[in-house]
């Protein structure tokens, strides 16, 4: 809530209330079957009002409020849970719901080895462990991401190396990834931020040239497509999150998957305390317990069939917003490759500071007052700027591999100027499949209204 600290009471109520009203989430079970499967013509935009900004007492551009989603579960989940309660086990190994999740997941993301787990963070840790990351090994990834992306690297005593990002894609810049490769580099974690596919051809080429493992962090990218191919199928290992805010959910959970014979057979062991249950072997790897239970799997199995409609609708609405704001001077829309499908876990545009007579904070507050569900930036600062990185205090205030001379990484000296600029100029807008074209058009009008008012 740090972005609200300097607000008046009225501004806080307007901004924070609207942001919570437009909460992340998946399509409600009640409306799942009626969700549109085809693109309908968008209503025409109305003229931009010349009246005073709402924050200065003028009328709101978004006058009808932010569309909500309602409950995101219902009869399909209830049926799966009732059937699950007739089983003799709630354990994942051999559990019918877990097997059903694997089958339905492969219809979305056709990978040979699929393992359910307790979270997206767990999925990423399993992937890093299966990739063989160990003390001092470097893994290149994004500085703008959830800490879950790097927790597994650190627990394996690896070293996160943060590369620069694309100006408006907010994804890894392949050229900078190439520059940061050293003899210690062992893997790349490509974060598809907000559901926008990374440049996977370029990253895969780099990985192949340097014999690196390419891990896809698909936590925010359920249903996204890269050049027509499902996200998760291009790299060596794919990781998904089922946390409550994601496109589909079981409250918390994850899936890690691969078709690569070097890694796929090990995913189950690294998520199940090292047990190789299929072959009944002893503990020949050290691992933690990241298992998903059958009740969680029952909910996931019920939600997976709705994913395509959710993803398609988010893509449609996000692309509509881009179309309507791309002409506004000083506004940088969320950049998506024309052959890709971004599934907009959120939408983020940037403002050009020199184009406006206001700060990003003032622009954001004015936009929120117009009735738009929005927030400033994404995370407060790049991961390397967080205190735990600045102090190298990952394990009880210490970083063993640095103490033993296995890395010279010093995060106090690390800088990614473009990533820092993204967070300093970005404004995040809520997008979900329960929204209407009319609302998105009103959001675009509000952005243009604020931009015109503050134009330099």
Explain the meaning of each model-derived region.
Residues 276-279, 323-325, 338, 364-426:
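Conserved PLP cofactor-binding pocket of PLP-dependent enzymes
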Residues 27-91, 97, 107:
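C-terminal segment of N-terminal export signals and the immediately downstream linker at the start
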Residues 2-20:
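N-terminal secretory signal peptides and thylakoid transit peptides that target proteins
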Residues 221-227, 231-346, 381:
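Active-site region of PLP-dependent enzymes
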Residues 355-362, 436-441:
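Short, conserved charged micro-motifs
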Residues 54, 129-218, 225:
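PLP-dependent aminotransferase-like
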Residues 91, 96-138, 152-154, 162, ...:
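Phosphate-binding glycine-rich loop
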């Amino acid at each position: 809530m740090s972005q609200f600290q300097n607000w008046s009471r009225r501004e806080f109520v307007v901004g924070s209330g609207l942001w919570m009203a437009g909460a992340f989430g998946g399509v409600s079970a009640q409306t799942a079957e009626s969700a549109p499967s085809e693109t309908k013509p968008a209503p025409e935009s109305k003229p931009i009002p010349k009246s005073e900004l709402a924050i200065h007492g003028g009328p709101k551009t978004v006058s009808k409020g932010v569309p909500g989603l309602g409950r995101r579960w219902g009869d399909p989940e209830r049926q799966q849970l009732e059937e699950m309660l007739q089983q003799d086990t709630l354990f994942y190994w051999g559990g019918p719901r877990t097997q059903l999740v694997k089958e339905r997941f492969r219809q979305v993301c056709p990978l040979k080895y699929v393992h359910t787990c307790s979270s997206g963070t767990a999925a990423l840790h399993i992937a890093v462990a299966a990739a063989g990351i160990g003390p001092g090994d470097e893994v290149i990834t994004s500085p703008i991401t959830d800490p879950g992306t790097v927790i597994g690297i650190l627990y394996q005593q690896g070293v996160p190396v943060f590369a620069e990002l694309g100006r408006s894609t907010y994804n890894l810049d392949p050229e900078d990834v190439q520059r940061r490769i050293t003899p210690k580099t062992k893997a790349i974690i490509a974060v598809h931020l907000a559901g926008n596919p990374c440049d996977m051809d370029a990253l895969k080429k780099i990985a192949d040239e340097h014999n690196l493992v390419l891990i896809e962090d698909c936590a925010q990218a359920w249903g996204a497509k890269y050049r027509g191919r499902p996200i998760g199928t291009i790299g060596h290992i794919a990781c998904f999150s089922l946390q409550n805010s994601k496109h589909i959910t079981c409250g918390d959970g994850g899936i890690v998957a691969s078709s690569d014979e070097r890694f796929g057979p090990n995913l189950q062991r690294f998520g199940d305390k090292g047990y190789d249950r299929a072959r009944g072997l002893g503990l020949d790897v050290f691992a933690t317990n990241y298992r998903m239970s059958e009740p969680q799997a029952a909910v996931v199995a019920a939600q997976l069939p709705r994913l395509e409609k959710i993803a398609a609708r988010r893509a449609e609405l996000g692309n509509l917003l881009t179309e309507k704001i791309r002409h506004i001077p000083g506004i940088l829309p969320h950049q998506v490759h024309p052959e890709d499908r971004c599934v907009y876990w959120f939408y983020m545009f940037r403002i050009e500071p020199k184009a406006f007579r206001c700060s990003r904070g003032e622009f954001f507050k004015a936009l929120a007052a117009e009735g738009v569900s929005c927030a400033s930036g994404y995370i407060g600062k790049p991961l390397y700027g967080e205190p735990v990185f600045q102090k190298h205090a990952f394990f009880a205030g210490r970083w063993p591999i640095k103490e033993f001379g296995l890395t010279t990484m010093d995060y106090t000296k690390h800088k990614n100027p473009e990533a820092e600029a993204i967070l300093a100029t970005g404004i995040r807008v809520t997008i979900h499949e329960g929204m209407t074209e009319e609302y998105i058009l009103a959001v675009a009008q509000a952005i243009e209204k604020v931009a015109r008012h503050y134009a330099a």
